[in-house]
Each structure stands twice: as C-alpha cells, then as structure tokens.
Amino acid sequence: MRSDQIKKGLKQAPARAMLRAVGVGDEDFGRPFVGVVNTFTDGMPCNFHLRELAQHLKAGLKEAGLFPFEFGAPAISDGISMGTPGMRASLVSREVIADSVELIAQGYLYDGMVGLSACDKTIPGTAMGVIRSGVPGMILYGGTIAPGEWQGRKLTIVEVFEAVGQRAAGKISEEELLEIERRAIPGPGACGGQYTANTMAMALEALGLSPVGYNAIPAVHPEKERATKEAGKILAWAIAHDWKPKDFLTRKSFLNAIAAVAATGGSTNAVLHLLALAKEAGVELSLDDFDQISRKTPVIADLRPWGTYTAWELYEAGGTALVFKRLLEAGLLFGEEKTLTGRTLAEEVERAYREQEGQKVVFPVEKALKPHGGLVVLKGNLAPKGAVLKLAGTERTYFEGPARVFDSEEAAMEKVLKGEIRPGDVVVIRYVGPKGAPGMPEMLSVTSAIVGEGLGPEVALLTDGRFSGGTRGLMIGHIAPEAFVGGPIALLEEGDRIRIDVEGRRLEVLLPEEELERRRARWRPRPPAFTHGLFARYAALVRQADEGAVLEDPL
C-alpha cells in the first residue's frame, strides 16, 4: 500500500505515535488509509449538512475495511457572493480546492481519496484534485435542496433573484419580495434546479466518477444516509483493484457527460468544468465537442431554470438513472464505458433504474421537449475562440440590436434597475473574464433582473464572464479571448450593431475589419485588479474560457 511509506517500518515509529493520538489502533495500520475532503461550511446551505454526512461516509469506509481521515477545503457560495466583489473568489476556489486535495493526498500518501462536495465549485474542484492525486477515488455530492413554496408554487433561489427585478419594476411589493426571500430556501442542500451544482453532479455520474443514482438523492432525503455508507464498499473495491479515475475516464466518458448536460438543459458552467476535468485526466476535449453533442442530443427533462420541475422532483421521478436509461435506449450514450465500480455505465444504469408511475419530468427521446440540446457554441469576429449560450433557456435564434457597453456588472445592474435598458438592446459586460475580474464572475444578478423586469425575450446579454446555472434568456458568456487580453469585445463602443445568429453559430459586430483594426491600434491594456496575493497569481496563470479557465502548467 502507498500509505505503508508513512505507517510501516522501524523509522516510522514517530509517525505511528502521532497517528495513534488521532485514533489509529494496532489493527488499523494494516488498513488502506483514505483521505476524505469535506467541503463543509456553516456559511451557506449547500454544504451546511456535510459535517453530518461525513460521519456516515466515514462509518461506511470503516465498515468496508478502510481507515478514513477527514480534512477541509474552502467553499464559496455563488448565491451569497453574486453581484458583489466576493464573486471573484468563486472560480478561483475551484483551483484552490483541487490543489488542496492534491496537497493532502501527496503529503499523507493516502491509498484512496473521496471528495464530499455540494456547491458549484466544490464539485469540479474536488474531482480535479482526486483525478490529479493518482489514487483510487470518487466524488459524492451532498444533494439538492428541497424546494420552497409560496402561493402554491415551488421556489428556488432563482425566483428570489428574479423577484429583485420584479420589485424594481413595481410588479411585486416589498412585502411579497420579503416573503419570497423567507420561503425560498427551507434547509440544507444545493440550489434546486438543473443549475450548476446539480448539472455537475449528474455529469460526474455519467463520467463514472460518482455512483450512478447517488448524486440525485436530495440532501435531506432519508435514503442519503444509507447510500453514503454503502459508498464505502465501492472505494474499498477500487483500492483493492488499484482502479484509478485515469483508468476509466476516456474521451467517450466525457462525451457521455456532455450528452447528459445537453439532455437536461444544464448549466453552461459544465463547459468550463468538463474541459478542466478532461485536462486532469489527459483526455482531449474542445468547445466543438459540446456543440456537436448538443446538436444531436434532444432535451428530454423538463427542469428549471427553463422548465417546470426541480431537482427534488427529478429524483422522485427516477433520478439520473432514468435520464441515462432514456439516452441509452436512443443510442446517445456510450454504455460500454467503465465506471468507478468496474462495471459499465449501462450496467450501473440497469442496477439503479426506477421510474415513478405517471411521472412528467423525463420523456422518451421520441417525445423530446426540444429537438436539440441546450449548449450552443458561437464564433465570429466578437468571439474568435468561441462563446457559449444555453439555448434551452430561450426560443429566440436570431437577434440584432445596438450594444449597451459596460465595463462592470455593477454599472450594468444600475442601468437595468433604473429601467434604462430597452427592448432590442444588447447588453455587453466586459473586463470580467478569467484574467480581467479576475475569476470570471457569474452575472446572475443582472440577468435575473432583466428577466424579472419582463425584458428576458427582448434583450440579449454578452459577457466574457460566466452565467449561473439558473440563468435563462438570450445570454451569451465565456467570450474568448476576453477584453483584458485585447479580445474583440474590448473594441466595442456604445451603439455598435451586434448580430447573434444561433442557427449559423455566429456572434458578430457589424463593422468592417478596417474599423476594428483602427480601434485595436488605439486600445491599451488595463492594469491588473490585484498586484499581489492569490488573485494576482491566479490572474497571471489562468488560461482563457475556451480552455476551461485552468491554470498554466510550468512545462
């Protein structure tokens, strides 16, 4: 065992003495040692319950003959930091989490790793770290929150964001906004639609890095405790057979994950995160793969933010296994791909498959809700390296209008709340990319305000930043190259005519190349937002969105 380097032999007596102090007994030195990264925090609901869940996980690992050691990693709430300078920390935390997992795995020479995650960046962050650690491992998702309720309709956090715009437009009262705020989040768990956390949780099941069916179990559902304990047996098998993530994560595994995201109208953040995970696994993946898979994968799940149902209701209907079953039946998944259990994806789906009688959440492919998946990649003179749109949130496929240019989200939000954005406008928010912000913050506050004011179908938004999984409307993000490095979005001026052609996959400013060249000659780079510390280092090393906003390796 790898951990024998720490716990066996004459010279390791001091190490054993220290391990005995934390509960390791004589018989435990013969067990595989496992690191459990727990992204618990009592600062947000997504990860609030992970302290208790970790106890069930560790009990299951011990029952399976392993010895677990728990450690922490940071967790940033997008819902709390949204629309504030704190949002810069969100994507940065993904890299910090991955580095933390790698650091502990290497420092303690553990034989296996488990990531216990819940909110948006803790899922890809722990997954990146577990893959990078080079030992058997898996990711367990804390689960979705239960929906809130107000006036007979189910609520998620997105309804609160949109209520801000409704209040600004005078469509609801201050008292109604307060009631929505009070009722939307009834307890622990991640945001309750097919937003980023639930999207990535499903994607990891399709990849084979999480047990099929586990991640769909809601945070406070009674089944979560039993399933968490059972997961220990899976890791014990993987360690016994030296079955590591890089042994089963293939290009086809990643195409399976993309298909799952496309079929459920999932978050555009999955593009960034799957690109980053593929890099860790040594798998070739590009933006074009997302577009190609999405073109042939219909939307078969009626899920929020664009649809009707919450993630809790998806679990009741049959969960991720039901989605995968439908896709396998249509030949849209590579069922022969192996998973962390050693069995194929198709075998795992058969073991986990169930369907609630009369459910209306997941449809057969022949009765799909939309003929094509939710992810669209646009290119053109505004996005030479690509931009990403979630089509499942809008029915418009062509838009042309004048640019309303803002160099920060705050400036755009001010105009939206004052009612100064008009139907037909194309709102441009730039200098908020991976290097420029830095950290590529999400724009949910401003997009939700636009939707809340009733402008969703009539206004488009472009940004070199990101969007929350809860975003809906004609919102195009991940524009690369970003403004900070001189990408064409930096050359836009107020009133420039923008054309968005979804069917043609084009994003363009209607200006002659000569004019763009004149503007490029006048353009000057901006000073960095940070000159020392973590954010300065991140900005110096981070790559563009089309490469997953991963950090540069030195070699």
UniProtKB/Swiss-Prot annotation:
EC number: 4.2.1.9
GO biological process: isoleucine biosynthetic process; L-valine biosynthetic process
GO MF entries: 2 iron, 2 sulfur cluster binding; dihydroxy-acid dehydratase activity; magnesium ion binding
Catalytic activity field: (2R)-2,3-dihydroxy-3-methylbutanoate = 3-methyl-2-oxobutanoate + H2O; (2R,3R)-2,3-dihydroxy-3-methylpentanoate = (S)-3-methyl-2-oxopentanoate + H2O
Cofactor: [2Fe-2S] cluster; Mg(2+)
UniProt enzyme class: lyase
Residues that bind [2Fe-2S] cluster: 46, 119, 191
Active-site feature positions: 468
Residue numbers binding Mg(2+): 78, 120-121, 442
Entry keywords, A to Z: 2Fe-2S, Amino-acid biosynthesis, Branched-chain amino acid biosynthesis, Iron, Iron-sulfur, Lyase, Magnesium, Metal-binding
PTM sites of type N6-carboxylysine: 121
Superkingdom of the organism of origin: Bacteria
Stated role: Functions in the biosynthesis of branched-chain amino acids. Catalyzes the dehydration of (2R,3R)-2,3-dihydroxy-3-methylpentanoate (2,3-dihydroxy-3-methylvalerate) into 2-oxo-3-methylpentanoate (2-oxo-3-methylvalerate) and of (2R)-2,3-dihydroxy-3-methylbutanoate (2,3-dihydroxyisovalerate) into 2-oxo-3-methylbutanoate (2-oxoisovalerate), the penultimate precursor to L-isoleucine and L-valine, respectively.
HAMAP family (UniProt xref): IlvD
Subunit structure: Homodimer.
Name of the molecule in the record: Dihydroxy-acid dehydratase
Gene name of the record: ilvD
